[in-house]
Swiss-Prot record:
Alphabetically ordered keywords of this record: 4Fe-4S, ATP-binding, Cytoplasm, Iron, Iron-sulfur, Metal-binding, Nucleotide-binding
Assembly and interaction partners: Heterotetramer of 2 Nubp1 and 2 Nubp2 chains.
Organism: Aedes aegypti (Yellowfever mosquito)
Gene that this sequence comes from: Nubp2
GO CC, alphabetical: cytosol
The protein, known as: Cytosolic Fe-S cluster assembly factor Nubp2 homolog
């Protein structure tokens, strides 16, 4: 049911634990705060975290004639969400599936969700380059997705995996919108000064090397972390923090390019 979607953006990461799902959810919330109609599709079948991050755990999806009806975050229906997390009885249930079953589920997510008219569909993918990614790329060929945002941390180990992600995108013909460097520095919750507790600048260097845009550098900010599970937009709750400014900049750049 992607014919009602104007723009499709994938969010990728080379490895787990880099904050990809947090970036996906906050980007979706940022776009919805800008009065766009947004969908967020969580295809991380083995680790669906979007329902938790948006405070939607316990919500159910139901069927209509057109397919699955997504869960909406509010009565305005500015943000619609679909995740396998809504289909599991318990959050701790493990999804132990082989490739063909995963492929079938992802195809169903891409073809059988009854999205209303959307300006943007953000697709939160699993880490790495697996069967799920290949299935998504094949399904999106017909609708010409806008591209992918790649999330990394500045450490060399994460950067090595992101290099593979960049190669994967180029080989599959997916446009790279840009790279986001996450968890770069720590913001003191008292004085808000940012200190580099690990290495920094790796995402910037990789973007230059791969000749793709660097979209921004996000620090570790306890105030932003406290929003997890609330479904609240960082740009609304913490408008002056660095993370909000970067997220708004990414959303503005995306909407400016597509207008």
């Amino acid at each position: 049911m992607l014919e009602k979607v104007k723009h499709i953006i994938l969010v990728l990461s080379g490895k787990g634990g880099v904050g990809k799902s947090t970036v996906s959810t906050q980007l979706a919330l940022t776009l919805s705060e800008s009065k766009f109609k947004v969908g967020l599709l969580d295809i991380d079948l083995c680790g669906p975290s979007v329902p938790y991050l948006l405070g939607l755990e316990g919500h159910d999806v139901h069927q209509c004639e057109e397919g699955w009806v997504p869960v909406y975050t509010n009565a305005d229906k500015n943000l619609a969400v679909m995740s396998i997390g809504f289909l599991l009885k318990n959050r701790t249930d493990a999804v132990i599936w082989r490739g063909p079953k995963k492929t079938a589920m992802i195809k169903q997510f891409l073809e059988d969700v009854a999205w209303e008219d959307l300006d943007y569909l953000i697709i939160d993918t699993p880490p790495g380059t697996s069967d799920e990614h290949i299935t998504v790329m094949e399904c999106l060929k017909a609708v010409n997705a806008d591209g992918a945002i790649i999330v990394t941390t500045p450490q060399e180990m994460a950067l090595e995996d992101v290099r593979k992600e960049v190669t994967f995108c180029k080989k599959t013909g997916i446009n790279i919108i840009g790279i986001v460097e996450n968890m770069s520095g720590f913001v003191c919750p008292n004085c808000t000064e940012c200190t580099n507790i690990f290495s920094s600048g790796g995402g910037v260097a990789l973007a230059e090397l791969a000749k793709v845009p660097h979209l921004g550098t996000l620090p570790i900010d306890p105030r932003v972390g406290a929003l997890a599970g609330s479904g609240k937009a960082c740009v609304k709750e913490l408008p002056d923090c660095t993370t909000s400014k970067i997220l708004q900049s990414i959303a503005d750049n995306i909407s400016a390019e597509k207008s």
